[in-house]
């Protein structure tokens, strides 16, 4: 692949992540661009989106519980 093609692929990927991030912000998911990129990559590799969402929710819940314990 030529460098021009590589640049076009990278630009397209950035634009896609930017669009997904904008949508993520509208939906108030709380995901930053880095986390969103990781999630997209995992889904592209075959991860189940519903399962991934459940894991993220569980991790957030556990994090909140730990923060509550440390603040008590």
From Swiss-Prot:
Assigned keywords, A-Z: Cytoplasm, Cytoskeleton
Keyword Cytoplasm found: yes
Compartment(s) of residence: Cytoplasm, Cytoskeleton, Microtubule organizing center, Spindle pole body
One of the record's GO cellular component terms: gamma-tubulin complex
Residues making up the signal peptide according to the UniProt record: none
InterPro entries attached to this UniProt entry: MZT1
Transmembrane segments: none
Source organism, top-level taxon: Eukaryota
Classification via Pfam families: MOZART1 (PF12554)
One Gene Ontology term from the biological process aspect of the record: mitotic spindle assembly
Similarity comment text for this entry: Belongs to the MOZART1 family.
Role played: Required for gamma-tubulin complex recruitment to the microtubule organizing center (MTOC).
Subunit architecture: Part of the gamma-tubulin complex.
Name of this protein: Mitotic-spindle organizing protein 1
Lineage: Eukaryota, Fungi, Dikarya, Basidiomycota, Agaricomycotina
């Amino acid at each position: 692949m030529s460098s021009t093609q590589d640049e076009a692929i990278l630009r397209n990927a950035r634009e896609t992540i930017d669009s997904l991030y904008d949508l993520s912000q509208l939906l108030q998911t709380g995901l930053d661009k880095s986390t969103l990129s990781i999630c997209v990559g995992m889904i592209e590799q075959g991860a189940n989106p519903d399962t991934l969402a459940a894991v993220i929710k569980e991790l957030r819940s556990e994090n909140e519980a730990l923060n509550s314990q440390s603040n008590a």
